[in-house]
UniProtKB/Swiss-Prot annotation:
GO terms for biological process: actin filament depolymerization; actin filament severing. Residues 1-21 are annotated as: Disordered. It comes from Schizosaccharomyces pombe (strain 972 / ATCC 24843) (Fission yeast). One of its GO terms (cellular component) is cytosol. InterPro entries: WD40/YVTN_repeat-like_dom_sf, WD40_repeat_dom_sf, WD40_rpt. This is Uncharacterized WD repeat-containing protein C9G1.05. The keyword Repeat applies. WD repeats lie at residues 56-95, 100-143, 144-184, 187-226, 229-268, 313-352, 356-393, 433-472, 477-516, 520-559, 564-594. Belongs to the WD repeat AIP1 family. Keywords: Repeat, WD repeat. One of its GO terms (molecular function) is actin lateral binding.
């Protein structure tokens, strides 16, 4: 038995309200690189499904840039660490790690030789550091600012120059190498969010919260012209590959393209979803990529500012997932209430129209042509999968915090922290208070039976008779609070996962223990799924691993180590040899399984 990772459906860039998002591109314009939670994502532009997830940072990542040679990536995080690693080979070997500053890295850039790096941010002793990529030795001093530095850009050709942008409303200009302070350019009246050299190094431009763009000579730092560009803050600026134009993105939902020689406006694109545009990159002459505050990537054609494509994904931990009956679509929901529908064949996400949950989605299940969701906003909601939207009038207040939901006959069983509710057409039929605190629920596929797991380490078996609940049995073989339950598709087995990482397998009819030796996880079981033949059980755990257990050979299992760096949350079988998994890293992974 073995498994292999086939593909990764990547998370979108991590963003913060009213803060710029840094996105890098390689010199060929074929790939982009960006931070996502504690990972760095390298993604092909043409084939978005082709991506790599770098998981070696121990703190949330903030920025990543390709070296001009294209062989290395430098990435920074919240703890001030910069990691330089090989992005060309399969092993992604670490070249060096440097603690540049004592706080959050906001931006970094390479010189033209791919030998020196300047990293800036929110330090305590200093706001920036210039060092060599291979040894970490200092190659100058980055000083002169009195507040956090938001951006840095280096001139790639000689004579080397560098410019930094700060919250102290100034741009500092440096001569190199070694990099020494030359002068401070105090032209902005508010925070300066971005500064970028043109690809031909003749000029650099700055943008800030005052809505203005200033363009300077690349060698001397002398101001060339000023543009009153946007009404709101400008978060990002990026040059076209031929240096003839540049693009700005703003808090006013607009993206504007400017003539670099005259400073005149060429064209403008206004976002229809009314989200702040916090990042932009111009990788090729025919493509601009814009990032909004939700992390969604919009591909624009610079010639007419028409949308070519929009890439959706999750930013936060994926907490719930379910598969459509025909296994063509995968529905996922995250900690921030984002719900997406993934086309499995295209490996592409689409947003659902309508009002979603306002915070964490606890569980999703299929019920006929609908997806039922419950969230920590104490509501149950219904998604019409044919229309691709939330049903406007189908919102049911749960009363208490919901724990789980399942379908029995024509009813929904809603389990909260205090009771078990029976719903028919989103109308309460009956309610039963519990003397224990429920923690999980699952329904039998062939009978009017369901089970509820409790924090008291017990599983309670219920039947539904004419809308009334009837407890028929208890299973008390777990030694930790129950976290996950799953009946096999043929109805023969009941798997019970707990907070210690152990899975107990029961005979669903006799309630006798078949095996209690599936105890190879070291963390809480968060998700379980049976294959269609009811021969193998896949489990997802907080310990970052995914295991596949065999009913016929209980001690034989497949271990997918470090499947999701921050914890695996859900698993679903697409076919007998293909598995989908979700994680707290906001990624979805496709696995090939061989028995």
């Amino acid at each position: 038995m073995s498994s292999q990772l086939k593909s990764t459906w990547a998370p979108v860039p991590s963003t913060k309200p009213s803060q710029p998002c840094k996105i890098g591109t390689d010199f060929k314009g074929e790939r982009i690189v960006y931070p996502a939670n504690k990972a760095i994502i390298i993604r092909e532009i043409e084939k978005q499904e082709n991506c790599f997830q770098y998981n070696e940072h121990t703190a949330p990542t903030t920025v990543a840039r390709f070296s001009p040679s294209g062989y290395y990536v430098a990435s920074g995080d919240n703890q001030g660490n910069v990691r330089i690693w090989d992005c060309a080979g399969e092993d992604k070997i670490l070249k060096n790690q440097v603690t540049a500053i004592s706080g959050r890295i906001t931006d970094l850039d390479w010189d033209g030789d791919s030998q020196r790096i300047i990293a800036v941010g929110e330090g305590k002793e200093r706001y920036g550091h210039a060092f060599t990529a291979d040894s970490g030795n200092s190659v100058g001093e980055i000083f002169g600012h009195s507040s956090v530095v938001n951006a840095v850009s280096l001139r790639k050709s000689r004579p080397f120059r560098a410019a930094t942008a700060s919250d102290d409303n100034s741009i500092n200009f440096f001569h190199g190498t070694p990099y020494r302070f030359n002068r401070s350019l105090r032209v902005h009246s508010k925070f300066v969010y971005d500064v970028r050299y043109s690809p031909n190094d003749e000029r650099f431009a700055s943008a800030g919260a005052d809505g203005k763009v200033y363009v300077f000579d690349g060698k001397t730092g002398d101001q060339v012209y000023e543009i009153d560009a946007h009404k709101g803050s400008i978060f990002s600026i990026s040059w076209s590959p031929d240096s003839s134009q540049f693009v700005t993105s703003s808090a006013g939902y607009s993206c504007k393209i400017w003539d670099a020689n005259t400073g005149s406006l060429i064209r403008e694109w206004l976002s229809s979803d009314k989200k702040q545009l916090v990042g932009t990159v111009w990788p090729t002459k025919d493509l601009i990529i814009v990032v909004n505050s939700k992390g969604n990537l919009t591909y624009l054609n610079p010639s007419d500012c028409k949308v070519i494509d929009t890439i959706y994904g999750h930013q936060r931990s994926i907490t719930a997932a379910t598969l459509s009956p025909d296994a063509t679509h995968f529905y996922t929901a995250s900690y921030d209430g984002t719900v997406l529908s993934w086309d499995i064949g295209k490996q592409k996400a689409f947003p659902l129209v309508g009002e979603s949950h306002t915070n964490q989605v606890m569980q999703m299940i299929m019920a006929d042509d609908h997806v039922i969701t419950i969230g920590m906003d104490d509501t149950l909601r219904v998604i019409d999968i044919k229309q691709g939207c939330f049903a406007k009038d189908n919102v049911f207040p749960t009363g208490y915090q919901p724990i789980g939901v399942c379908s029995v006959e024509d009813c929904l069983i809603l389990v909260t922290v205090s009771d078990i509710q029976v719903l028919r057409s989103l109308t309460g039929v009956s309610t039963a208070k519990t003397i224990y605190q429920p923690s999980a629920v699952a329904s039998h596929p062939l009978k009017s039976e369901f089970c509820v797991g409790g924090e008291d380490c017990c599983v309670y078996i219920h039947t539904l008779e004419k809308g009334e609940l009837c407890e028929v049995a208890q299973c008390k073989d777990s030694t930790a609070p129950i976290t996950c339950l799953a009946y096999s598709p043929d109805g023969k087995y009941l798997a019970c996962g707990d907070a210690s990482g152990k899975v107990v397998l029961y005979d669903a009819n006799s309630r006798e223990v078949i095996t209690s030796r599936w105890a190879f996880h070291t963390g809480r079981i968060l998700g379980m799924s049976w294959n269609a033949k009811s021969t193998h059980l896949a489990t997802a755990s907080l310990d970052t691993n995914i295991h596949i257990y065999s009913v016929e050979r209980p001690m034989k299992y497949i271990a997918m180590k470090n499947a999701h760096s921050l914890g695996a949350t859900q698993v679903e079988w697409v076919s007998e040899n293909e598995l989908l998994s979700t994680g707290s890293d906001a990624a979805i992974k496709v696995w090939s399984v061989t028995f």
